[in-house]
């Protein structure tokens, strides 16, 4: 078992090596668009009739074959996601086959089904990690946001996974439906003793809303910034938050991020360079949030598809205005943000600009208010 303290270092080293060699180190496999929840901001969830109209899910044999080809090309890490991957009755056929290939398999799940026989099978053959999306701090919020009173069940399942020694992380998306629960969610993560990642920027769901760029079930830029600042206040040491505010005020914030942009440059993250996303119906994308460029490994074979995806990703150019912006260190801008907000990779995402301005303003104000309180 890999020590978790060295995992980020190991992953970064492998992806850096993969970039030099043109290898697909990480693959994201979107096993299904189906889900037992009905969250309004989801970027992939489709009803069965929509799936039938658009195509069909890949079979277990097809997923396993693609994984084998990807592994032979260099893939080490694989993430099984959805929709909710556990709604597939053949999930463990796919999962065990990938484990037997020697892949480091992680799982994204809403956590509601991880009990009974499913939990037993995960304990017997543990994944590298399970990432649980936590959508609120109460059953009431879950009913409003997901259509089900699932909070207690999800929390119980997270505790059971942790008790079994399985690495669990919580992913939290803040929307108009659960904004009021942020502190309660943080407290629950602390009680469970699990790492939590929060985001308040929501990509427009262009893959399921008919290409309505810039639209989405999300907070206003100011509200999204408010949630981000509150999260920083909750998680950062006072001196770290103060330094962050100072850097923002000087427009010189530098932070470690997976997605970054340079002036007149292309994609700055791993998407399409050392990582890829397979959709439920067999398309390969650089990132699950992007509608294109798309290639088709079922028809082309994985090697050719990967080479074409890398080449197409290399042609993407982001807004020069974003790359030269002094605020970009505090901004969520990336290729996926640009395309989902504007319909163009080189379009300036005004929502992200407004959110960044508000994040800087509110962070600086919060730091000054805290300083005054400490002096009193």
Predicted regions, residues:
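Short loop/turn motifs at secondary-structure junctions
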Residues: 38, 74, 126, 166-167, ...
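Residue-level signal for the nucleotide or nucleotide-sugar donor/cofactor binding architecture
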Residues: 58, 89, 149, 177-180, ...
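Flexible mid-to-C-terminal extensions adjoining Fe-S/redox cofactors in radical SAM and related proteins
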Residues: 4-13, 18, 23, 45, ...
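Short glycine-enriched, charge-decorated loop/helix-capping segments at active-site entrances
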Residues: 48-57, 143-150, 340
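Conserved alpha-helical substructure of the radical SAM core
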Residues: 1-129
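Short coil/loop residues immediately preceding or within conserved phosphate-binding loops
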Residues: 26, 272-273
